[in-house]
Amino acid sequence: MASRTSRTSGHKRRAKKNIEKGVAHIHSTFNNTIVLITDEAGNAVSWSSAGSLGFKGSRKSTPFAAQLAGEAAAKAAMEQNMHSVAISVKGPGPGRESAIRAVAAAGLEITAISDVTPVPHNGSRPPKQRRA
C-alpha cells in the first residue's frame, strides 16, 4: 500500500502585512467596476470587481454590484490592518459613487478623493451615441 501524504492546496498562504495607509483605485466603466486597493508604493493589497463576485452581463454595470465590490476589497484590505485610504476614481460608469460609499461604510477612513479620468486632447473618435 502506498503511504498517504497530506496534500495542501497549490496556493501559498499570504502573510498578514501591517499596512496603515493605502490608495483605493476605483475603475468604473459602463460594463464593470473594479476596485483595487494598493499600499502607498503602488503594490496591490486587495482587489475585487463586479464580475469576480459572480455578476454577469448587464448586472455587472449596476451600482449595487459596484457596492459589493467596494465592500469586498475594503474588508480584504482591513484584514491587512489598513485603516485609511485615499480614493482615486477613473471612468464614467454608474458604479462610481456607490463604490466610494461602500469603501467608507466598510470602515476605512477616507483621506482624499480625486478624479483621475483621462480626458483626450481631441484624440480618437468616440463611440456613437446610444439609442435607448
From Swiss-Prot:
Superkingdom assignment: Bacteria
Swiss-Prot/TrEMBL keywords: Ribonucleoprotein, Ribosomal protein, RNA-binding, rRNA-binding
Record flagged with keyword Lipid metabolism: no
GO biological process, one term: translation
Keyword Ribosomal protein on entry: yes
Protein family according to the UniProt entry: Belongs to the universal ribosomal protein uS11 family.
Subunit structure: Part of the 30S ribosomal subunit. Interacts with proteins S7 and S18. Binds to IF-3.
Protein name stated in the entry: Small ribosomal subunit protein uS11
Species per Swiss-Prot/TrEMBL record: Oenococcus oeni (strain ATCC BAA-331 / PSU-1)
Gene that this polypeptide is encoded by: rpsK
